[in-house]
């Protein structure tokens, strides 16, 4: 499907002017006539390029503070006119064919993201003429090329050179897809913003703007196809958000290893998000989306050694995340000790990568150093619907804890309690975590009764010969009965951290007092399903 179309006239009107001067220079040097509007036209003229203002071409001035620029038959007729079919009427009305449209849209997303953005500010950044030209050109892609991404500029010039001043239908069709994706995402952002304003805008309502729009529009970009999904009979792909600002598995760079699988990505996300909770050098080992070993240490090697000791059996074939650069010593320890699917860290030294290269199947990802955690939304698909909630970024500090028992925790118990509370947030409910000296010693995950999670954590610790006596225990939600406390006490736990809030809190606290256990209430729950 070659069907080449020569590019003789291009209309350029962009908000993001990155690369536009160089692109316009390349087009002009190849004999392409340039039409432009407003700030883009002024910029090109300042650079000495021969450019015709759209208002001069149409004979109709820009008006209403730039609200009306390109909404004119001589513009849209030139874009929508079908070559070989509409030529007579175009000639009759002095409409010149426009072969390429280069447009990106007003920065609506950036505007509404600014603190203190008013509805009036948002409205003035809703592009009208831009999307209209984009859709017109994309509709008529058989004859017209539409360019909405500056990243395409170089490839377009190369193809024009390779095809004697023309672009192929395949290229124009691909550009049209990008254009429709661009306008769909743009309109979705506007719809989401206006939808969230409904409570504050209707009638005499004094309600604040809603957190969730009445219609939720989502746009994700496909990053990769996968061999299969969670199971081999399921097809799958990985989609990511555009302009993600926080270091994540979605933004990470894979520096070695096989392509990531569906399960690799899910588990790596769980490991990375958990290790982000710690300021000290930390290591998190994950299996089936649950931490099976977590520790902080004097170095990441120390942290890895301690995390691995929690559950070496489960660590086999796991995902390992660090919050510091992967160094050669740690890489060697991992490769020598265990089979690992993925290692992710902010960065990796050259020496470390030489060591991991010996195991070509090991996937190594670098994600960059992270800063402040970015608020966002979490989604859970149910049959016929979507559950949406704020991302769980909640965490408590020592000053927010309430001691509810007769005995106060020791300094080490308190440190361990805060440590295992951070881990429990990332363990599937019902979640119980035993910790001692800033390392997990037993993790009970995903049980239907909390007492069995507590028992499993104790069994795990015993199996690995880890001393539970003097340890702290975290529970992601309250204890409905005292049995979980009794099980923990039998194992040797001396401090418990939990949300509180059960109708039997008094009974649970009394059990802790009976066993001489210090108990801390967080008043915050961390269910994870």
UniProtKB/Swiss-Prot annotation:
Keywords: Acetylation, Hydrolase, Multifunctional enzyme, Purine biosynthesis, Transferase. GO terms for cellular component: cytosol. It holds the Pfam family AICARFT_IMPCHas. Its EC number is 2.1.2.3, 3.5.4.10. It catalyses: (6R)-10-formyltetrahydrofolate + 5-amino-1-(5-phospho-beta-D-ribosyl)imidazole-4-carboxamide = 5-formamido-1-(5-phospho-D-ribosyl)imidazole-4-carboxamide + (6S)-5,6,7,8-tetrahydrofolate; IMP + H2O = 5-formamido-1-(5-phospho-D-ribosyl)imidazole-4-carboxamide. The modification N6-acetyllysine is found at residue 287. Pathway: Purine metabolism; IMP biosynthesis via de novo pathway; 5-formamido-1-(5-phospho-D-ribosyl)imidazole-4-carboxamide from 5-amino-1-(5-phospho-D-ribosyl)imidazole-4-carboxamide (10-formyl THF route): step 1/1; Purine metabolism; IMP biosynthesis via de novo pathway; IMP from 5-formamido-1-(5-phospho-D-ribosyl)imidazole-4-carboxamide: step 1/1. GO terms for molecular function: IMP cyclohydrolase activity; phosphoribosylaminoimidazolecarboxamide formyltransferase activity. It comes from the Bacteria. Residues 1-148 form the MGS-like domain. Disulfide bonds: none annotated. GO terms for biological process: 'de novo' IMP biosynthetic process. InterPro entries: AICAR_Tfase_dup_dom_sf (IPR024051), Cytidine_deaminase-like (IPR016193), MGS-like_dom (IPR011607), MGS-like_dom_sf (IPR036914), PurH-like (IPR002695). Belongs to the PurH family. The IMP cyclohydrolase activity resides in the N-terminal region. This is Bifunctional purine biosynthesis protein PurH. It comes from Escherichia coli O1:K1 / APEC. The lineage of its organism: Bacteria, Pseudomonadati, Pseudomonadota, Gammaproteobacteria, Enterobacterales. The gene is purH.
């Amino acid at each position: 499907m070659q069907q080449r179309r020569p590019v003789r006239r291009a209309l350029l009107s962009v908000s993001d002017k990155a690369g536009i001067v160089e692109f316009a220079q390349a087009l002009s040097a190849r004999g392409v006539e340039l039409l432009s509007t407003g700030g883009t036209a002024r910029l090109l003229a300042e650079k000495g390029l021969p450019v015709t203002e759209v208002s001069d071409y149409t004979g109709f001035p820009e008006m209403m503070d730039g609200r009306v620029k390109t909404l004119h038959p001589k513009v849209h007729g030139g874009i929508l006119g079908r070559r070989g079919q509409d030529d007579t009427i175009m000639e009759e009305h002095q409409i010149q064919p426009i072969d390429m449209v280069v447009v990106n849209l007003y920065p609506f997303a950036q505007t509404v993201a600014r603190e203190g953005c008013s509805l009036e500010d948002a409205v003035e950044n809703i592009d009208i003429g831009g999307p209209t030209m984009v859709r017109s050109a994309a509709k008529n892609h058989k004859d017209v090329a539409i360019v909405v991404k500056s990243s395409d500029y170089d490839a377009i010039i190369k193809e024009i050179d390779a095809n004697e001043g023309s672009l192929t239908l395949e290229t124009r069709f691909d550009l049209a897809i990008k254009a429709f994706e661009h306008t769909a995402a743009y309109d979705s952002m506007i719809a989401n913003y206006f939808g969230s304003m409904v409570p504050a805008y209707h009638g005499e309502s004094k309600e604040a703007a809603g957190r969730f729009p009445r219609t939720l529009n989502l746009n994700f970009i496909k990053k990769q196809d996968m061999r299969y999904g969670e199971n081999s009979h399921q097809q799958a792909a990985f989609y990511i958000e555009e302009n993600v600002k926080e270091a994540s598995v979605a933004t990470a760079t894979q520096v070695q290893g096989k392509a990531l699988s569906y399960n690799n990505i899910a588990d790596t996300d769980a490991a990375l998000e958990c290790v982000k909770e710690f300021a000290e050098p930390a290591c998190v080992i994950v299996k089936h989306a649950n931490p099976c070993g977590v520790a902080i240490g004097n170095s990441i090697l120390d942290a890895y050694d301690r995390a691995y000791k929690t559950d070496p059996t489960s660590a086999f074939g796991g995902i390992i995340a660090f919050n510091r650069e992967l160094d050669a010593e740690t890489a060697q320890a991992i490769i020598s000790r265990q089979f690992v699917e993925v290692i992710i860290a902010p960065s990796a030294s050259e020496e470390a990568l030489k060591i991991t290269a010996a195991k070509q199947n090991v996937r190594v990802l670098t994600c960059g150093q992270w800063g402040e955690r970015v608020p966002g939304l979490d989604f859970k698909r149910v049959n016929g619907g979507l559950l949406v909630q704020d991302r769980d970024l909640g965490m408590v500090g020592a000053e927010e804890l309430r001691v509810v028992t007769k005995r106060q925790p020791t300094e080490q118990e308190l440190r361990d309690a805060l440590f295992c509370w951070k881990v429990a947030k990332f363990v599937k409910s019902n979640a119980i975590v035993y910790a001692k000296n800033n390392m997990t010693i037993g993790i009970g995950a995903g049980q239907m009764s909390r007492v069995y999670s507590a028992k499993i954590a104790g069994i795990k610790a015993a199996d690995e010969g880890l001393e539970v006596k003097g340890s702290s225990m975290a529970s992601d939600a309250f204890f409905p009965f005292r049995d979980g406390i009794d099980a923990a006490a039998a194992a040797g736990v001396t401090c418990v951290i939990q949300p509180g809030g059960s109708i039997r809190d008094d009974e649970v606290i009394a059990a802790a007092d009976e066993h001489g256990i210090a108990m801390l209430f967080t008043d915050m729950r961390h269910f994870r399903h």
